[in-house]
Amino acid sequence: MRTLSFASKQFDSDLAVFRSGAAISREVSDSVAAILCDIRARGDAAVAHYALGFDGARLRPGEFRVGAREIADAARRLPAARRAALSAAHASIEDFNRKALPADWTARNRHGAVVGEKFDPIRRVGIYVPGGEVPLVSTALMTATLARIAQCPEIAAFTPCGADGRVAPDLLAAL
């Protein structure tokens, strides 16, 4: 692992080299902007076009949504060992994150006024889970579990499908 030391004489140049690796090229930025503009203009038809181009998936507008039944079926079709592993991971993530949730509190200040904080869940949460060739099941577990324990009433998950137009069953089960 490469380290940077503030005490080093070449710290500024080393930092510049390090930061340049995170820069997004103008070409990539322009390409993404054009795709987003097209999707805003043409909606689901544009999404289907890019799914074919990037993922090789032939999708039709109106067929993007995966229903609760398909998610439950995907979980049931998994081998028992994988279901158990997902369940254990979910329990660990939930246990950890429940401990990290902030708690409401109130107190009286020196003037006798009641002060405090109240934490309410975000009403609507969207989570993106990288999918396609290599679905990131861990991302689905981490983000969906946290949104649930935070009691977000509406959680929408977005993920690309494979070339067959299907979402990986492991990923669906993790949601």
For the regions a protein language model found, what residue spans apply to each?
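Short, low-complexity, polar/charged sequence segments that are solvent-exposed and flexible
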Residues: 22-25, 145-146, 175
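Residues within well-ordered alpha helices
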Residues: 38, 50, 146, 173-174
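N-terminal Rossmann-like NAD(P)+-binding subdomain of aldehyde/semialdehyde dehydrogenases
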Residues: 1-123
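Conserved small-residue-rich beta-alpha loop and adjacent elements
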Residues: 107-173
